[in-house]
Amino acid sequence: MADPWNYAGPVTQLGPGGGAVTLVDESTFAISGGAGDITAGAAQGLFFRDTRILSQFEVLLNGNRAEPLAAVTDDPFSATFVARDAPAPGRADSTLMVFRHRHVGQGMREEVVLRNFGDEATVCSVDVLVDADFADLFAVKEGRVDSDPRHGSVTTRVEEHLSDGEGEGSLALNYTYSRGPVDRGVEIHAPGAKRVTPGLLTFEVVVPARGEWSTCVEIGPIIDGRVFAPKYRCGEPVERATPSERLAEWRRQVPLVETDHPLLKQVVARSAEDLGALRIFDPDFPERAVVAAGAPWFMTVFGRD
């Protein structure tokens, strides 16, 4: 995970309407705005196996969107979004920063961190707006979700997941989609949430002076009754997840090219990173990797490849 304070790579500076950010891991990909929000009605979302399992994911502080500052993407499947809360009345600047650490892979994990740089504790409400429409990937890409004749029914329910003895229990929001034999779903786990209702996760937060508060939201897909565990789990080190370990091993094995031509060096390095990002793996033979094409919308092996 990149540390925005010490990061030395490229950083996207954001203002209103910042550009899109795309994260990919095999058949999972997420497209959001530059501030990190997945906005309802846009050609954005979290996709798994050609289905949009998350059509909205927006973080609000006290009912308002934070001001985006930067986005850092140093891996194909992870990004950090940095923003700040609106200044308090009578103050020229804000003392509350928001860091959203996102990882995708067979679902999504998002850690939300609030850091208070002020000398007084800050009380605020964190709302996460969520929705799932299970739209077909092609309908989203072509902007015809509303006219897609293959609509099914979506039901929602809130579930309480009890503690296993090692931590606190959590609330989960479950969306289920049915259309004939097609059965899709998604579970959104929100440990520490004060309230969970369809479309909304609410956290009541006190951030101590010169301190921080954090929570982690975990999104897992369901296909034909099978629940897929996200590759990145809340509470587990991200560097131990399979995509991170595979990419680290790839980077160790890539040949080093020594040249005094800076452009050639940059092209070779970029090509190696792209090849590492485009690899897909057979679940039955995980040691076998092939390079796909068409990321993110058509991440598969084409005949011409």
Predicted regions and their residues:
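Beta-sheet-dominated interaction scaffolds and their linkers
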Residues: 94-105, 126
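Catalytic-loop motifs flanking and including active-site residues across diverse enzymes
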Residues: 305
